[in-house]
């Protein structure tokens, strides 16, 4: 655990987290623009949650040896991964239990101070159906993979948070 504590205090750990998020975001854009799979509202919200983890990685990169900055990164990571997991589970439910009484919104809704779909519609505009399964890999749908990814992030975060209490004396 001391090794993980030390690893969380160097920029490499936060940079690796950021690289993973860049990979996932690039994958999402590849699905959208190269494979022509239309993103739905939940896909866009899950994309924003993933970017939140990227933001947490950037916070940690600033000065991971500083206790306050490192914990701000952990908190942002946890909030973003938790929100992403909630969204992905809801998205899986839309796909596996389609119902006319339980559907996702028709349009993305962002705050007026951050209308991401207006600023970058190529990345944040949704025009797909949340309940439609458009892609599978190893029998899992995209939202099911996102459940694994966000849950994996929460597990990794928990391990790093626990490691914070194992200091060299």
From Swiss-Prot:
Instruction: Note the Pfam families from the entry.
Output: DsbB
- Gene Ontology CC annotations of this record: plasma membrane
Some GO term, biological process aspect, for this entry: which one?
A: protein folding
In this entry, the parts of the chain located on the Cytoplasmic side of the membrane are 1-13, 65-71, 164-169
Q: Which residues lie on this side of the membrane: Periplasmic?
A: 31-48, 90-144
What disulfide bonds does the UniProt entry report for this chain?
40-43, 104-130
Q: Which UniProt keywords apply?
A: Cell inner membrane, Cell membrane, Chaperone, Disulfide bond, Electron transport, Membrane, Oxidoreductase, Redox-active center, Transmembrane, Transmembrane helix, Transport
Coarsely, its chief localization is membrane
Entry-linked Gene3D superfamilies: DsbB-like (1.20.1550.10)
**Which GO MF term does the entry hold, naming one?**
electron transfer activity
Membrane topology according to the record: Multi-pass membrane protein
- Where in or outside the cell? Cell inner membrane
> Which chain regions cross the lipid bilayer?
14-30, 49-64, 72-89, 145-163
Q: Which family does it belong to?
A: Belongs to the DsbB family.
Task: Please describe what this protein does.
Answer: Required for disulfide bond formation in some periplasmic proteins. Acts by oxidizing the DsbA protein.
Q: What is this protein called?
A: Disulfide bond formation protein B
Species of origin reads Aliivibrio fischeri (strain ATCC 700601 / ES114) (Vibrio fischeri)
